[in-house]
């Protein structure tokens, strides 16, 4: 694991649920890659999670990764809460099922492939990486909204 990748992620949703987009900006050495996508009906949390998941999935080899997110839900979920969810068979302490368990499980499987540091950054502030990820997420959301408009 000799390569270090810095990733900025964000999600955007119009309504909750509603059309949403996700975006990620990856930096490796002197190279940057932008990725984004959308879902026609989703939530802001699912888009935040999908941005991180898709960014991790495109890494070709085991890496040291810093992921910057403005989602406390994502950061706390993957670093703190997930351990109890796994022990409780994907249920919370009140026995209610964990929301977005499908995505949490996919993210958890990525943890074994990389050394990941999850870092929170204030959203819509002066962090250029977060601003770029937000623009990508908004682009995804706008794509979803255009498709829905065409579908009538």
From Swiss-Prot:
Catalytic activity: Endonucleolytic cleavage to 5'-phosphomonoester
Cofactor(s) listed: Mg(2+)
Pfam families the UniProt entry points to: RNase_H
Intracellular or extracellular location(s): Cytoplasm
The protein's enzyme class: hydrolase
Residues in RNase H type-1 domain copies: 1-142
Taxonomy, superkingdom: Bacteria
Molecular function GO terms recorded: magnesium ion binding; nucleic acid binding; RNA-DNA hybrid ribonuclease activity
Residues at which Mg(2+) 2 binds: 10, 134
Predominant place of localization: cytoplasm
InterPro entries in alphabetical order: RNase_H, RNaseH-like_sf, RNaseH_domain, RNaseH_sf, RNaseHI
Keywords: Cytoplasm, Endonuclease, Hydrolase, Magnesium, Metal-binding, Nuclease
Record GO cellular component, one term: cytoplasm
Cofactor binding note of this UniProt entry: Binds 1 Mg(2+) ion per subunit. May bind a second metal ion at a regulatory site, or after substrate binding.
Binding site for Mg(2+) 1: 10, 48, 70
E.C. code: 3.1.26.4
GO BP term (any one): DNA replication, removal of RNA primer
Functional note: Endonuclease that specifically degrades the RNA of RNA-DNA hybrids.
Subunit relationships: Monomer.
NCBIfam families per the UniProt record, alphabetical: PRK00203.1
Family membership noted in the UniProt record: Belongs to the RNase H family.
Name by which UniProt lists this protein: Ribonuclease HI
Species whose genome carries this gene: Rickettsia prowazekii (strain Madrid E)
Gene from which the chain derives: rnhA
